[in-house]
């Protein structure tokens, strides 16, 4: 191609030039929560859309973790996107050698059966080499995640008929869940081997997962016990690979160490887990003659639930959300903490993340001991003291209450921090109005599906709370339980001391920042500046038309892109915005005038 023309000789050249850039729509309703759950991956982000999804991944709560579970589930009553991170403090995985090894101790007298596999990443990078190599003490199968819930699992297997011709399949309890007996796979035939297939069933022995004891949770038909086996289409078919990749309940551990199998692979086939030997025509059923239906049912045990999470474990979970470029999130929702000082520590830590990201807010509630079970006056004092210990920040949003909700899983009433529902109200405001509308008041600020609140402050108490930048949650006669304030924790008088303004600017900044990526590495000239202005102004006009701002001005010209700025390879644009203000105080003047007075004479005088 020539320097100044598209061709050195006469020709027709077609070019497409795209000047249709717009400021993109951005999400404003995604939450992030770290808590203690009975099941599920640890220190890994999982996006859930509703309560049923929360149960499916993290299991229904018991009494120990009901508060954290319902804190997450109540946010999902208002919206449909919550990243959940499970923390772990001492939780251990159940495994199939728990009974034989539960009394084993090391040289220091410590129990040696502790197994902790927290997530797929943890398994792949650390634990697989320790527990999957047939030389550890994990047993043949390990529960997928830490927790006593894994003790409800049983893994049952059925090998191919043995060399004596015994058809194990006919004597197996779970034959009805499979189409036919296991035989020889195509992989084995291709490698001059026989009888390598095996069926595996994962059973909910006690009914803790499904509510029905003995339910079949998963089935894996026609797996191969030959190491490295694949299906005709090239997919892994070695039973350890399949379980590791597909099972939601177990990992495949060390076969040789499981007491149910005995030493040296007795009762399971002495060639299981080996490569087929083409020269010797491997018969993978060798050694399975002692198989029985009872022997096939490997009960998992030794699983231990997590204790209450420490500050370090909670903050480690939230560290997964510290990079705004890799994960989109709008609310960082802290769980209930162990002490008042812990609640302050976590709130201030999350505020630091929010201020670094500049695209999310942190709704927080005081510690439970200062709110539940104390007088309303003391609760008010404690809420204000809690707020006074927090950092000054427009990214913090403080409320004063706990919500009384019904825990249907444990048939009890519990109190949960209000902050997750406060975040939910803000997310719901995005759907019914826009982020720049106040979430407070009877139009948008009602709390859903709650029985009561710990305290309902009166007018005087609400005044004291609001002065301390604490948003009261109150039971207002004729209205219900509502968020009765829309302040951030910005203590300096500012437009950013209101939630709607903070969230307005978050939305605008995110959208325009995305649009600005299109001008990176372009020339800082009049054309590029005009292109940028033509992208930004329609966005601001639309927000103005939807009542988010009253006026604006975009400056992006030679006045702020001086020759010095251009020579530094910089680009400067300034957006001047007058945000809409929510009504916090209403004054109604009722003026009596004499009969003969013209209203024009008195209007404006009072």
Q: Over which residues does each language-model region extend?
A:
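Extended, beta-strand-rich, solvent-exposed assembly scaffolds of outer structural proteins
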Residues: 52-58, 70-73, 91-93, 100-233, ...
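Structured, hydrophobic secondary-structure cores that serve as assembly/anchoring elements
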Residues: 1-112, 139-140, 144, 194, ...
